[in-house]
Amino acid sequence: MQIVRALPDIAKTRTEFETYTLQWVGMEDIAVPLTLNIGGGKQQSLPAKANVYVSLDDAAEKGIHMSRLHAILNQLASQVCDKEGLDLLLRNMVASQGKISRSAKVELVFDLLLPKPSLLSNETGFQTYRIEIGGQCLSEKYDYSLKITVPYSSTCPCSAALSRQLFSDAIDNEFSTSRIDKQELLSWALTSTVATPHSQRSYAYLNLLLGNHGWPSLSSFIMQIEEAIGTPVQTMVKRTDEQEFARLNADNLMFCEDAARNVKTLLEQSSWIEDYWFKVEHQESLHAHNAVVIDQKYSKGAML
């Protein structure tokens, strides 16, 4: 006959350390599958990493019940991850700790995979965007945040002007007479690369505070960001798409300040955003350093 013995649980013993409350105790980097509404009536299932925390408000308690938090987090695998679902998750996290916790926090980090059509050729590729959804319940008050990283292309206006000057000088050197044959000029232009403006892959990092509001369609909002900047990076391209991409960059020459103002205009027009912090980063191909702009709506230290 097998004897069933009770397993020791030292967490129930009183702490031998100083009795202090602790703001956040939990686990980080937990794997969990998510299902998200991405817009247009579509859903996407994807792998994510989660950080979960609760407050330890009973100073006499040795620690929290971590396995209970893990079990509650696993429930996300069988439901759509939206504000209502995270409200319930946070409430259950607090309740799972008995009376030793009054607050809970969750952070979900994942790569959203979206189809991206080519500019002209009707081809389609796929692009990932790093997303972080954060939620917390403080004394039954809910607050949410959304972090998004969006890459784009930027071409320097100063470099473009310098390149145009060199091209003008080359025409002057090549054609010495005051009258130039149009066809001869066109033929020369097609075979003569005098100078090219420098451009680079750039990034917009957005940290948005939503208050007690849900987030919009992620795919639609990402598209709005890309349209505001004007030069989104591409996936699958053919020569006609690459040429159109070159035209877009010429039509949207920008310093980092220009990109930042375009982003800020969009954020200011988005009524569902209560506060924001953002950074645009141009990873210079001319310089060995990056050009950046950092801005925020309100001067809140938590956003820095």
Swiss-Prot record:
Pfam family, one: GCHY-1
Catalytic activity: GTP + H2O = 7,8-dihydroneopterin 3'-triphosphate + formate + H(+)
Enzyme Commission designation: 3.5.4.16
Keywords assigned by UniProt, alphabetized: Hydrolase
Domain of life: Bacteria
Site feature May be catalytically important, where: 156
Pathway: Cofactor biosynthesis; 7,8-dihydroneopterin triphosphate biosynthesis; 7,8-dihydroneopterin triphosphate from GTP: step 1/1
PANTHER family in the cross-refs: GTP CYCLOHYDROLASE MPTA
Role noted for this protein: Converts GTP to 7,8-dihydroneopterin triphosphate.
Family in the record: Belongs to the GTP cyclohydrolase IV family.
Protein name per Swiss-Prot or TrEMBL: GTP cyclohydrolase FolE2
Record lineage: Bacteria, Pseudomonadati, Pseudomonadota, Gammaproteobacteria, Oceanospirillales
